[in-house]
C-alpha cells in the first residue's frame, strides 16, 4: 500500500507554496466556472444511478482517463467489492465536473462512503497551475458540502507528454486519439472497438524522457497536496508508478502519453485499492 501524505507533512511545506483562497470565484478563476455538460453520457449517469437506487460505496470523478476504466478487467478486479460508480467523461475540465455535481445533480441520489478525484489535465492548455488547483479545491469543497460524511482521495494529476516532444510525431498521436475520442463520445461506446484502438496505439511504443514531460503538472500537484487534512480529505500522487526507472513515460503504459493502457489501469488499481478500503472503513467507524 502506498502511504497517504500525513497532514503534518503537508502543513510543513505550506508556506513555500501558493495559497488557495477560501472562496474561489468564477470571475477570478476560469477553472471554477461551471461548464454545462448536459450530454448523453451525463444523462446516462442519472438513469443508471436511479435504476441502482444510488448504490455504490465509492465514486470516481474525472475526465477521459477515469472514463476509460469502463471495460477494463482491472476495474472489477480491484474495485468490484466496493460497487464502484464511474463518473468520468472524456474531455472534462474542472468546470465540467463542478457543473455535473451541482446543476447536473449527479450526486443527489448517491450515498458514497468515498470518492476518488483525478481531474485537471484538460485544463493545462489554458489555465495556470494555481487556477487548476483552485478548480480541484472547489470540487472537493462541493463534495464535502453535499456529502458531509464522505472521505475523499484526491489524486495528483497524472504525468503526461508535452507538446511536440514525443518520439512519435504529434500528427501520429492526434490521428490515433481521434477515433478513441469519437467512440467515447457515444452514449454507449463499443468497448471491444475501444480496446482495439488502444492496442493499435500500443504497437507504436516509445518513451518520453522525464525532461520532456508536462511541466505544469508538478506545480498543480504541489498545491493540491495542501488539501490533505488527514481526516476527510487525503492526497496521493501515484504518478511515479507510471514512469520508468529514469522518470520517463513508457508508451506501453500510456500509448498516447496521456491515456492509459490496460497495464496502466492495473497499475492505477494496485496503487489505490488499499487506500479506498481504508477510507471506507473510516467512514464506517463514524
Where are these regions (language model features)?
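Solvent-exposed, polar/charged alpha-helical surfaces in well-ordered, non-transmembrane soluble domains
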Residues: 87, 95, 99, 130, ...
Amino acid at each position: 500500500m502506498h502511504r497517504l501524505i500525513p497532514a503534518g507533512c503537508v502543513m510543513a511545506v505550506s508556506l513555500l507554496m501558493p495559497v488557495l483562497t477560501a472562496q474561489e470565484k468564477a470571475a477570478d478563476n476560469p477553472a471554477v466556472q461551471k461548464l454545462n455538460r448536459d450530454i448523453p453520457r451525463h444523462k446516462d449517469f442519472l438513469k443508471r444511478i436511479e435504476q441502482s437506487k444510488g448504490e455504490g460505496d465509492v465514486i470516481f470523478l474525472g475526465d477521459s482517463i477515469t472514463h476509460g476504466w469502463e471495460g477494463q478487467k482491472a476495474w472489477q478486479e480491484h474495485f468490484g467489492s466496493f460497487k464502484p460508480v464511474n463518473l468520468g467523461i472524456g474531455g472534462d475540465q474542472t468546470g465540467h465536473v463542478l457543473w455535473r455535481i451541482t446543476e447536473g445533480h449527479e450526486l443527489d441520489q448517491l450515498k458514497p462512503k468515498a470518492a476518488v478525484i483525478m481531474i485537471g489535465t484538460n485544463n493545462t492548455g489554458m489555465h495556470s497551475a494555481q487556477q487548476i488547483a483552485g478548480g480541484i479545491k472547489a470540487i472537493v469543497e462541493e463534495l464535502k458540502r453535499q456529502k458531509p460524511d464522505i472521505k475523499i482521495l484526491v489524486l495528483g494529476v497524472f504525468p503526461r507528454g508535452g507538446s511536440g516532444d514525443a518520439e512519435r510525431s504529434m500528427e501520429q498521436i492526434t490521428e490515433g486519439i481521434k477515433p478513441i475520442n469519437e467512440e467515447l463520445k457515444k452514449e454507449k461506446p463499443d468497448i471491444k472497438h475501444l480496446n482495439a484502438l488502444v492496442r493499435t496505439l500500443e504497437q507504436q511504443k516509445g518513451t518520453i524522457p522525464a525532461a520532456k514531460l508536462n511541466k505544469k503538472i508538478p506545480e498543480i500537484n504541489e498545491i493540491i497536496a495542501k488539501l490533505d487534512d488527514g481526516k476527510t480529505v487525503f492526497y496521493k500522487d501515484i504518478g511515479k508508478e507510471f514512469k520508468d526507472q529514469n522518470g520517463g513515460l513508457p508508451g506501453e503504459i500510456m500509448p498516447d502519453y496521456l491515456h492509459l493502457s490496460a497495464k496502466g489501469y492495473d497499475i492505477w488499481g494496485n496503487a489505490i485499492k488499499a487506500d479506498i478500503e481504508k477510507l471506507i472503513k473510516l467512514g464506517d467507524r463514524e
